[in-house]
Amino acid sequence: MKYGLSILLACTALVPAPALAQAAPTADDIAALRAQIQALQSQLNQLQAAQQAQAAEVAKVASAPVPVPPKAEAPGWWGGTTISGKAFLNVSNIEQRSTDLAGNKTDNIQYGTQAELKRFYIGIDHKFNDVFSANVTTDFRYNANGTSKDVLVYVKKAYVQAKLNKAFAVRVGAADLPWVPFAEGVYGYRFVEPTLIDRTKFGTSTDWGVHAFGTFGNGLVNYAVSAINGAGYKTLSRSSNTIDLEGRVSVNPVKSITLAVGGYSGKLGKSNDTVNVHNRATRFNALAAYTDKRIRAGVEYFSAKNWNNITTAAVPLPPLDTPNDKSHGWSGFGSFAFTPKVAVFGRYDWVKPTQTVAVGTDGPVKDHYFNIGVDYKPLPPLDFALVYKRERARNGFINTANGNIGGLDNGTYDEIGLFGQVVF
């Protein structure tokens, strides 16, 4: 009724004053006006009812429980499994010659141009939970140094790992050794050449045994230690009755600086009850490097005792090796990235593999090696490098990753080509 009076007054106000003076509203006019007011009141009531119904529906929807999505089905055993791979390949020309004491020169079988797939790794990692995991990595080697036409396949890694925390993890089986894989990570160009002791056969990358490692102080200090068979990952047999030890401690006082020392002691898997073993091989390693996004520079050093002299007789006869034979060498390496895709790099190695002087020579064997190159990285998993390598050994031979280099007078090894790496 309140609304009706308001409308009536409004309508009355709209009527011109002279009209009111001339004629009073009739009963029919009043009845019509009341009918209009009732119609408006009915429409207003309907509008209010519709608004209330809408509000009730919204409240009903808001108060309804949110449906719980169905729980995803847990993946099978393959859910924690990843597969990775890495390949080292090259197309290059090699010129290798040996010169004897009479001055005669002989070309090596590697002489010429060829393509090689030097390494092809396939790795399978499986994570059981946050503590336990396992890894198997195969190592394929094709046409090694041009001397073998078959495919050599090895189990490079096969281990079970328990990682209790950042400070302590342990692996049982064939796994990375403390020094060579660490040095490869600092060097950065393993696909071009192995690092110092791996190139000259004074160390290897993996072996069978028990391996512990960890880090302290938010990466300030890292350590690794291995108790191993000593014969390397290519040999798995109970042919030795001793355990070899290898260890490393590295420090990063700042993010870009790495300082490390390491060591090895053992009989390299050659000790058993049927072999006379007179010596124990030992090795000391050191490394210092600076690395950032553009610059990589470092130096690596090693010294070894009786590394190639485990089974030599106490009083040597004709063999060159003698008791307490000593070896040492160093490597300097560096690279500079002009852009994230283009970098130049280089390296120089000097090695004295033995202190023994062969008859007719003027001193012990000495090996000089260097490489220089330009690396192009179109994508993070790909590297293509144009490389030149040069090696010269005097007064004898040295067994290296590129073959047996040298001559009784001297020997040279030159290689130029395209070297690549594919990682997935």
Can you say where each PLM-predicted feature lies in the sequence?
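Outer-membrane beta-barrel pore domains
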Residues: E95-S98, D107-I109, G146-S148, A158-K163, ...
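A general secondary-structure boundary signal
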Residues: D29-Q36, L40, L47, G79-T81, ...
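Outer membrane beta-barrel
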Residues: P70-L101, I109-A231, S239-V261, F333-F338, ...
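N-terminal signal peptide c-region/cleavage motif recognized by signal peptidases
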Residues: P16-P18
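N-terminal periplasmic/intermembrane-space "pro-region" immediately following the signal or transit peptide
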Residues: S6-C11, L20-A102, F424
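Alpha-helix capping and helix-loop boundary segments enriched in small/acidic/polar residues
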Residues: L236-S237, L408
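Active-site-proximal beta-alpha loop/turn segments in soluble metabolic enzymes
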Residues: S226-L236, G266-D273
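Positively charged n-region of N-terminal signal peptides that target proteins for export
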Residues: M1-G4
